[in-house]
Amino acid sequence: MPQNSISAQLSNLHQLVADLEAIENGGKKAISNTIKDVKARAPGWIAQEVTAVYNIKKSEITPSGSGKPKKMAGSIQITGETIEELAITYKGRLLTPVHFGMTPKAPPRGKSYTLKAQVLKGQKKVIGRYLNTRTTGGPFSQRSHNILMGTGNTKSDGTSWIPFQRMSKTRTDIKKLTTISVPQMITSDRTNEAIMLRLNTETSKRLEHHMKRALGL
């Protein structure tokens, strides 16, 4: 009897160890799949939160994956081999108002115009005015404070005009008018809390999904 009892205990122990190993392996696979998911999906989650606040197209932050590549307003990349090591890397230049629904897109010939843009959704604002003074030099005269200048672009999907701001009375002392960058949009007080909540929520969902699949639940 003692021998039979010991044999039964050992048999149960082997099964328990096998079950634990299966759970451990399933857990490792679930974590690995979750990391892959987050790396692939997180840029889209972040872009959705950014575009909910800022008037910029999602396609300018995350590539569509189809069609020919275009110059992006910025980029978002997720790195790390464990959930604890996952890190967000974002890059981007200061953007001109062209990216935020600027009007007019081209200067009306021989007329005064008011430049407007909507950086924050629902908040279209005046960013400059050009008064056609009919003075020598036209739009490049000293009295023209904000002007649209041609970029020389010949492509249908390119930018042909961008705004410049006069910095002094010197005719050539002008500077490209810029607004905000993708990194600034991501770290902004307007979006950062929502982004972190979205990342935590979605990561937990993906981990739970893969754990259930790995354990056959």
Predicted regions and their residues:
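Short, Lys/Arg-rich flexible segments
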Residues: 1-217
